[in-house]
Amino acid sequence: VLLLGMGFLSAPAKAQKVVIEDDAPNSIVLVSQDKAGDEIVRIMNETQSPRFHDPKAPRFVLTDRKGRFALGIGGYVKATAEYDFGGISDDVDFYPSMIPNGGQNYVRNQFQMDATTSTIFLKLVGRTKHLGDFVVYTAGNFRGGSKVFELQNAYVSFLGFTMGYDYSTFMDLAALPPSIDYAGPAGQVFSRATLLRYERAFGKGWKAGVGIEMPVVDGITNQSVNISNQRMPNFPAYIQYAWNKSSHIRVAG
């Protein structure tokens, strides 16, 4: 798998530069006029998606003159190759439900390559008196029909609220294991939706969230069975307890 990150850097020509760099993996280098860039680095890091296939914080960003707002432009190029020795699935992703039964016609051996999961994103972060830390994020890859660009995320987040198109509140992104296969492990809960969500941390290690989401219904239809229009939104909610940075338990419904 080949990963490539790209970014751009801008700074006032006559301003005194302060270079701010953290030492963590996938760290950020920020050039600004003063130490206000520390807040930008913190917000970029704290708002990263924990999902393995999502891009991390951009290493280079564009900032305003005071270093209070920053726009990250980045992504990665990813290519995978696979060889199927037993005709398991005629798809670039692995879905156990697509494994054919005996007697069906299928190619026993197959070689495939795919680069459609390569991702591009824009991330605007900042901090204001009334909104606190805020994030405006949009990302997409080329998983649309005929390999066209497809929106994956587009939302704004502030004061615990998230509005836009994002992963469902029902999902636990931090619980998804790393995988080469973009589809992820069998049986995982995975859903994106247009939503309005509110999340808040409280107590020691506790966090809860509730959302209003656009429902998406999928099923098998025929001449006698069809899917009707949805009259009500979904109302997912969760509560989570974490005893350290890498361990937690969550109940969602």
Model-predicted segments: where are they?
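Detector for outer-membrane/organellar transmembrane beta-barrel domains
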Residues: 244-253
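Intrinsically disordered, low-complexity segments enriched in Ser/Pro/Gly/Ala and basic residues
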Residues: 9, 26, 31, 104, ...
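Polar low-complexity intrinsically disordered regions enriched in Ser/Thr and small residues
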Residues: 8-10, 14, 40, 90, ...
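N-terminal periplasmic/intermembrane-space "pro-region" immediately following the signal or transit peptide
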Residues: 13-85
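Outer membrane beta-barrel
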Residues: 64-93, 103-217, 231-232, 236, ...
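Bacterial N-terminal signal peptides
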Residues: 1-8
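Solvent-exposed loop segments that connect transmembrane elements
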Residues: 96-101, 218-230
